[in-house]
Amino acid sequence: MKTTINNWKLTDSQPMQYVKCSFKSNEGGEYNHYKLIQMDLINPDTKKYEVYFDTLCVDDYLESMRGELSIILASYGYGDDEEDCAEIIERMMEEYGDDVFQVVCECIFEYYGSFQAEVLFTGSEQDCIKFIENYCENN
């Protein structure tokens, strides 16, 4: 299993989650747009998995969905869902530094799962692993 492929970083080996920064803001030099891909088991009986993909921007959640972002971050143990998400993220910066927005995007991606993301492929576990590695090599 490769830990980096074409600037995609493996962030969670269980679902084969890879993350790649797709945009760096000019204001403050923060990375806040990320592409994410991973696989999940969709049918334990047939051992079928699906690969799904999304592009997320932290600013979208900070501007219009602050309460929802607080709930998402709280569900991963990063604060209280009654807190303002900016305060939660500020505390997270102490732990994650420059990677804080990547971690926030990972939380959003995992929270919504394939419900919000685009399903790219369905197949066996090995076929999905190969698909993800190929996707990362070519994108």
Describe the residue ranges of each PLM region.
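Extreme N-terminal leader/activation tails
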Residues: 2-20
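Intrinsically disordered and other compositionally biased segments
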Residues: 6-8, 24, 126
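Short, charged alpha-helical segments
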Residues: 123, 127-130
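Acidic, low-complexity, intrinsically disordered interaction modules
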Residues: 19-123
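Short intrinsically disordered terminal tails
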Residues: 1-4, 130-139
